[in-house]
Structure formats: structure tokens, C-alpha cells
Design a protein with these regions (language model features):
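RNA-binding accessory domains that recognize and position tRNA/RNA substrates
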Residues: 1-220, 234
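Cysteine-nucleophile active-site neighborhood
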Residues: 223-224, 229-268
Length: 268
């Protein structure tokens, strides 16, 4: 859809708060997009945020007011695609300016089926979320009552295994080809490309699916195991907690973000 064609819409939160704006990106199914509304304070790096699998199931609000000025480039993606439910911005750049840009941000969102809304008071929204915490919300072209009902019915990220939708389907290896190089096994709960790149500077990295068992990991004879970031509720990942618990004490383990929470569950 042309960026010159204005599509009026609104974001309504579960508490009834209304933010009117202009729809951008893809047209949501049934004209309504819903999810857990959160905010991110980065000044640049919006592509990295949008393609971070940790935001699966969430609607990401950017506190910085001007987003999209340098377009979009797949070289800056942190995963194979965006996994967030939606995007909220104050002002979407009408033109991108970068020799690296492959598409306007609006076009990138449309390509991957990610809806968004622009032109709203993100400062007010951020202050509200700061005080209340993440809250379910819905946005689209529907009437306020319909959006409010959808927001109220949105379960958010609790009680859902979001990792299953973002983890790799098959194991793969990157980094050093030296068979004597230090070998790290990285669990992909929603791992970012930049983390894999950093680990690869240390030796050889085998990235494995979230459902990989402890025996399968130990068969790879790793020097250490890395538990990645990822989306959603750690209480829904008993299969990962079981595997991690069986690895504790048998191989060095390091976890960040969701991986840290899962390690905490495994050791009590």
C-alpha cells in the first residue's frame, strides 16, 4: 500500500486507554492486531529490535520519536524475520536515506506481515506502561469498542510457549573449522545473530533447537553450553528445564535473559 495513502486507526489498551493514529505496515488479519504492548528506548537500531525473537507475541513501542530514517537492510536483521505482533511509532520517516537501505521500513513491515500504527502520543503511552507494566492492547481500523474487546481478550505472553515458533528447526554449526577449537553448544530459544557471531569468535558453535535433550548435547562434547535469550513465559518450557537440569554439574553453563530464567528454574 502506498505510504501516501492514510489509513486511520487507533490503539486501545486493556484498561480502555485510546491512542488514535495512522496504520502502517501490513494490514492485520480481521483488521485488528493484538498483543502485549511494551516499549523500547533505543535511539537507533530499530531493525535489530524488530527482528529480535524475544519480542514474539508483543507490540513494540519505540520511545524515540522518529523511526525509519535509514530504511531497512537484511544485513542488520537479528533473525530470519520479525516475530513481533506489531509496531508503534510517533513519526514514521516518509523517506529513507542510506546507501545500505534495501527498502523503506513500511515496506519491510508489509513484506513480513507486521502491522503498525504511527502518529500516536508515544510519550503518554510509555509513561502509562512504565507505571502499569506491560499491558495487552489491540490496534486497527475498527471501532473503539471492538478494539477494547480484543485487547481485553488478549492473553499476552503468559501461559504460551512462544519459543516453539522462533527456535531453529535443525542444528547447525558456525565459526572455526578447526576440530581442536573450543566447542560451544548454544540452545536457540530465540537467539540473536549478533550473539552467535560473538560466540563464533571463541571457536566453534553448534546452535541447537530448544527441544534438544541433554544426552544429545553431551554427545556433541561441548566445552560449554550457552542458553540464549528468547520470548515468553519460562514456566511453559518444562522440556528445556529438564534438559538443563540434567546438564548442570556435567558441563559449564551460561544463560542470558530467558536462558538465565530457565537455568534458575532448573537449579531451584
Amino acid at each position: 500500500m502506498s505510504r501516501n495513502q492514510i489509513r486511520e486507526g487507533a490503539l486501545v489498551l486493556a484498561d480502555g486507554s485510546v491512542f488514535e493514529g495512522e496504520l502502517i505496515g501490513a494490514t492485520p488479519a480481521s483488521s485488528v492486531a493484538s498483543g502485549e504492548v511494551v516499549f523500547n528506548t533505543v535511539l537507533s537500531g530499530y531493525q535489530e529490535v524488530l527482528t529480535d525473537p524475544s519480542y514474539a507475541g508483543q507490540i513494540v513501542t519505540f520511545t524515540y520519536p522518529h523511526i525509519g530514517n535509514y530504511g531497512a537492510s537484511t544485513a542488520d536483521f537479528e533473525s530470519r524475520r520479525p516475530f513481533c505482533r506489531g509496531v508503534v511509532v510517533r513519526d514514521l520517516a516518509r523517506r529513507e536515506s542510506s546507501y545500505r537501505s534495501e527498502a523503506h521500513l513500511d515496506a519491510m513491515l508489509d513484506k513480513y506481515g507486521i502491522p503498525g500504527i504511527a502518529g500516536i502520543d508515544t510519550r503518554r503511552l510509555t509513561r502509562l506502561l512504565r507505571d502499569t507494566g506491560a499491558m495487552s492492547g489491540a490496534f486497527g481500523s475498527g471501532d473503539f469498542a471492538t478494539l477494547a474487546g480484543t485487547a481485553a481478550a488478549e492473553p499476552g505472553t503468559d501461559g504460551v510457549d512462544l519459543v516453539a515458533g522462533v527456535t531453529t528447526a535443525d542444528a547447525y554449526t558456525v565459526g572455526s573449522s578447526d576440530p581442536n577449537a573450543r566447542h560451544i553448544v548454544a540452545y536457540d530459544f530465540g537467539i540473536k545473530y549478533s550473539i552467535i557471531d560473538h560466540l563464533a569468535t571463541l571457536g566453534r558453535v553448534t546452535v541447537v533447537p530448544a527441544s534438544t535433550t541433554a544426552d544429545e548435547v553431551l554427545a556433541l562434547k561441548p566445552a560449554g553450553v550457552f542458553l540464549s535469550n528468547g520470548p515468553g513465559d519460562p514456566a511453559m518450557l518444562d522440556y528445556a528445564v529438564t534438559a538443563i537440569g540434567e546438564l548442570v554439574g556435567r558441563v559449564p553453563i551460561f544463560g542470558i535473559c530467558l536462558g538465565h530464567q530457565l537455568l534458575s528454574r532448573a537449579i531451584g
